[in-house]
Design a protein with these regions (language model features):
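Conserved beta-strand-loop surface patch within small alpha/beta domains used
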Residues: 1-56, 65-112
């Protein structure tokens, strides 16, 4: 049985990609927060959501590498979003979860 796609609101995806792009040549780390189980916010430089939020995904960028983490970079049971700025003119965001000793990619859809 396949997992259902993850859905990220377009405005939030744009905020994430913008934060990664403006941090160049540095990287970003933070979390995507959720309200009522749905991704709703971005906290760059922090892994602590506010009172009515939960962590939906860990987030980091790789300015000079692909958006492909090793299993060791992933926390078991936690979704991770990785942004790559490695390809000139193209920003890439991919979702990952650790499955045993491997990094398993999840389908990520951006919707209005």
């Amino acid at each position: 049985m396949s997992e259902s796609p993850l859905v990220l609101p377009r405005r939030l995806a744009i905020r994430i990609l913008h934060a990664a792009q403006t941090a160049q040549p540095g990287s970003i780390r933070g979390v995507v927060t959720a309200r009522a189980g749905q991704p709703s916010g971005l906290r760059v430089g922090s892994d602590t959501p506010v009172a009515d939020e939960t962590v939906w995904a860990a987030l980091w960028s790789c300015p000079q590498a692909e958006a492909v983490p090793s299993a060791g970079e992933l926390v078991p049971g936690q979704l991770s979003l990785v942004v790559s700025l490695n390809t000139k003119g193209v920003l890439e965001m991919r979702a990952w979860q650790r499955q045993g000793d491997t990094a398993s990619e999840r389908v990520l859809q951006i919707r209005d």
